[in-house]
Amino acid sequence: MSRCRLIYSSISSKEIVSNDTIKALVKRSAENNLRDKITGLLLLSGDRFLQVLEGDSKAVNRLYGKIYQDPRHREVELISFESIDVHYFETWGMRLVDLYDLPTHPRRFLMDKYEHVDGNIQIPTRLHEVFSLLLDAKTLCHPSVP
């Protein structure tokens, strides 16, 4: 079984505006991902999503295809797709990190490290910065989770 990590970004369509809607979607996604043995993190900054998915290559590709076709996403952009031996989000069925709702200290740390506009952290364009943001979000937002 080939394992992979896929990272993409997108912009929320107008259909997803409330945090309650997003949280319900993440809950359903976590259940589906558990079934499909996919793990990952969904980062939200304003109307922008950054998501990492890890798991079986076929399952991850199938899920990305659904996301790409989902009208709740606009401008879906594949950032990285790679085979992996090491999983960084192996215990996370799917977690939502809303950067706007972070406590002051973690939010300030991220705003000092990454570009931001109108209080929203910008999704980086360089792969190493994208991965750094995902790992920072994982560590700062859920430090007790490996």
Predicted feature residues:
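Charge-rich, low-complexity N-terminal segments
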Residues: 1-146
